[in-house]
From Swiss-Prot:
GO terms for cellular component: plasma membrane. Belongs to the KdpA family. It holds the Pfam family KdpA. This is Potassium-transporting ATPase potassium-binding subunit. The keyword Transcription does not apply. Part of the high-affinity ATP-driven potassium transport (or Kdp) system, which catalyzes the hydrolysis of ATP coupled with the electrogenic transport of potassium into the cytoplasm. This subunit binds the periplasmic potassium ions and delivers the ions to the membrane domain of KdpB through an intramembrane tunnel. The chain crosses the membrane at residues 3-23, 64-84, 135-155, 179-199, 254-274, 284-304, 330-350, 357-376, 421-441, 488-508, 527-547. It comes from Methylorubrum populi (strain ATCC BAA-705 / NCIMB 13946 / BJ001). It is found in: Cell inner membrane. The keyword Acetylation does not apply. The gene is kdpA. One of its GO terms (molecular function) is potassium ion binding. It is a multi-pass membrane protein.
Length: 571
């Protein structure tokens, strides 16, 4: 570890923190329907969209109506994307003549992008046409991200409102998120990335002659526009198979920094939106502080592990750090920081191969996802996931003192706690249950390229990433099989919607309650004590669930490496 490395980490954190208040203030005005700097340009478009769709912007929905609208919308998105992938060989904008995507891979890909996971069992430049990338994947990148923001706002309204039957309009929230937040920022980011050297073209791949005289095909395409939303919307699906390790997808150190910042920007700002909407910004800062504690701890462990290098090689006298699977132009610190950022948010983009990290260096990205993607998390999804843990933390505190817990003047009762636990428990059920299934079936055991604990880690990481809607992977797993395409699709769908629906039920229940004044026995939820309680509950309730599985994978791999033991390749 070096001073320059820690300076890079500090610079990243400073830039993200500087964006929290201005972005939070702007998005609060957007969600409240107030006038913004873009209203003269976008308000007529917004009204036109409502008229075309027959939507009354003043009509709000109950939590059930909001949820049903969301589910129907996503079902239609899945069908349309699946159809594009299956028919791409007969559709235009296919200069490289890509064949139709196989049914099981199309299923996996459609579920992946609709759920904001962007797990990719294919290489983008060798499998998909430009039309599939632009008309199929990119709209889902926008809409799945906007859905996460909309749902976070709906849950926030549950805390902010009193004696209300409604939590907002899904159609209005979705439109405003896309039109006023995602689209303008992505246009600016696309221009920036083109300036940095990313391709943005509809032309076919370029044939070039190398210095050795060999012919090489260089894939290009509408890269910059897809990278803009894949990072801002915490989607993570790469245009190229190498994702952000590809020089056309991450050409410079400045582009690398901006991509990391945009992964966190909206998720961090949503904590400020929450504070503003409930009338106490300190509540948002407390939630962000809890996220920050977990994030910085993860960065420190990952950076230290990668800088220390492999225990096996260290025992042989080599101590240059672990550069396997990393771009030399980024180095250890930028690779480690990117890995923690992309898994703390539900992004999944990578600028290094996580499968090549040390055992402890790979454990932290996996643990980030297993906690439920609540360390900033996906746009919107991180906030509503963290608020679920807030309710559980207050319930635990209430048990310790023998009184009904309260949060922002709302009593937290049995219904809210049951819904919160349902949202929390569905993730380990999918992550551990499907991983266990894969370890006992021949089709599952055929996937990992490594034997021993690292092979198990590859399986566990895959289902963890799918259920957490992250999309990153340990690349040693062969995932493009019928077994993995279908089971991963199941994990992605359950991990997305079985968290969303309970969160909306909580929103509806809280919105209907009256707001009570704080009393002498009310636990302050804006100070260090509450931040510590929240972090502790997250680690105990969320983290300990996975300790036995982690002990069989990265933990035993690290201990074996420290003892000089290695495992042969092959499943």
């Amino acid at each position: 570890m070096t001073l320059i490395g820690w300076f890079q980490i500090a610079l990243f954190c400073a830039v993200v923190l500087a964006l929290v208040k201005p972005l939070g203030a702007y998005m609060t005005r957007v969600f409240a329907g107030e006038r913004t700097i873009l209203s003269p340009l976008l308000a007529p478009i917004e009204r036109g969209l409502y008229r075309a769709a027959g939507i009354d912007a003043r009509h709000e929905q109950t939590w059930l109506g909001y949820g049903l609208a969301m589910l129907v919308f996503h079902a239609l998105g899945f069908v349309s994307l699946y159809a594009i992938l299956r028919l791409q060989d007969g559709l235009p904008l296919n200069p490289m003549g890509q064949a139709a995507v196989a049914p099981d891979l199309a299923l996996n890909t459609a579920v992946s992008f609709v759920t904001n996971t962007n797990w990719q069992n294919y290489g983008g430049e060798s499998t998909l046409s430009y039309l599939s990338q632009m008309l199929g994947l990119t709209p889902q990148n926008f809409l799945s991200a906007a859905t996460g923001l909309a749902l976070a706002v709906a849950l926030t309204r549950g805390f902010a409102r009193a004696s209300s039957r409604t939590v907002g309009s899904f159609w209005v929230d979705l439109t405003r998120c896309t039109l006023y937040v995602l689209l303008p920022l992505c246009i600016g980011l696309t221009l920036f990335y083109v300036w940095q050297g990313m391709p943005q073209t509809l032309g076919a791949s370029v044939d070039a002659t190398t210095l050795e005289g060999a012919r090489q095909t260089i894939a290009v395409g509408p890269v910059a526009s897809q990278v803009a939303i894949k990072m801002l919307g915490t989607n993570g699906g790469g245009f190229f198979n190498a994702n952000a390790a590809h020089p056309f997808e991450n050409p410079t150190a400045l582009a690398n920094l901006v991509q990391m910042v945009t992964i966190f920007a909206l998720g961090a700002a949503m904590t400020n939106v929450f504070g503003r909407m409930v009338g106490d910004e300190r509540q948002g800062w407390a939630i962000l502080a809890a996220m920050g504690v977990l994030f910085l701890a993860g960065v420190a462990v990952t950076y230290a592990s990668e800088a220390a290098g492999s225990p096996v090689l260290n025992g042989l006298g080599f101590s240059a750090g672990n550069m396997e699977g990393k771009e030399i132009r980024f180095g250890i610190v930028a690779s480690a920081l990117f890995a923690v950022v992309t898994t703390a948010a539900s992004c999944g983009a990578v600028n290094a191969m996580h499968d090549s990290f040390t055992a402890l260096g790979g454990l932290i990205p996996m643990l980030n996802m297993q906690l439920g993607e609540i360390i900033v998390g996906g746009v919107g999804a991180g906030l509503y996931g963290m608020l679920v843990f807030v309710l559980v933390a207050l319930f635990v505190a209430g048990l310790m003192v023998g009184r009904t817990p309260e949060y922002l003047g709302k009593k937290i009762e049995a219904k809210e706690v049951k819904m919160a636990m349902l949202a929390i428990l569905c993730l380990p059920l999918m992550m551990l249950g499907l991983a266990a299934l894969a370890t006992v079936l021949p089709a599952g055991l055929a996937g990992p390229a490594n034997a021993g604990p690292h092979g198990f880690s590859e399986i566990l990481y895959a289902f963890t990433s799918a259920a957490a809607n992250n999309g990153s992977a340990f690349g040693g797993l062969t995932g493009n099989t019928l077994f993995y395409n279908t089971t991963l699709a199941l994990g992605m769908a359950v991990g997305r919607f079985m968290v969303i629906v309970p969160a909306l039920a909580i929103a509806g229940s809280l919105a209907a309650k009256k707001t009570l004044p704080a009393s002498a026995g009310t636990l302050p939820t804006h100070g260090g004590l509450f931040v510590g309680l929240l972090v502790g509950v997250i680690l105990i309730v969320g983290g300990l669930t996975f300790f036995p599985a982690l002990a069989l994978g990265p933990v035993v791999e690290h201990l074996a490496g420290a003892a000089g033991q290695t495992f042969a390749a092959g499943g």
